[in-house]
Amino acid sequence: MGRDIGWADTVRFRLPPGWAVDVEEHEGQPVGTFRPPPPAAGVLRLVTDRVVPRPDGGSPVADTLQEIALRFVRPQDPRAGDRTVDSRPDGAVIAQAMMRTDEDGRAETHYLWLVGAVRAGAAAVAMFSFALPALMDGDESCAETLGRIDDAIRTAEIL
């Protein structure tokens, strides 16, 4: 069945069963980390943010949210692909992309999601990244894991 995870008073989602939950710190910001049960590979990371448009900017919060989603899919980055930005029936925005990286000799594939909505005059966003070794990308167990994560993220509730 999984377990409900709430993060930073911004997002709630259902983590698949058996996943380990931890917190890392990156540049002074807490990062939720979630690891699938063995033998599955990879790590899901989560950060959140709330962006209030500048009062003198004149653009509505919904425009700010759309701009964040479009920047999230990295249109200028040649490493990114499979970019989409969609709206859910509840008004939330979902942006998705995939990126291949090579850091310190480690080839990795990163699946990226942003779920955001207008909440209390701000653009509230949850940004998820699932990283796995590139050689595991396409493996049947990884495809199953990705399917579960995708379902959980697409149905995440922005608070």
Model-derived segments and spans:
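Secretory pathway targeting signatures of secreted, lumenal, and periplasmic proteins
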Residues: 2-71, 104-106
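Short hydrophobic/glycine-rich mini-motifs in sensory/regulatory modules
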Residues: 120-127
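Signature of long, low-cysteine stretches enriched in small and polar/charged residues
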Residues: 66-120
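Short amphipathic beta-strand/extended segments with alternating polar/hydrophobic composition
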Residues: 44-47, 110-114, 128
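Surface-exposed amphipathic alpha-helical segments
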Residues: 127-159
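Short glycine-aromatic motifs
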Residues: 18-20, 91-93, 156
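Structural motif
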Residues: 11-14, 120, 144, 148
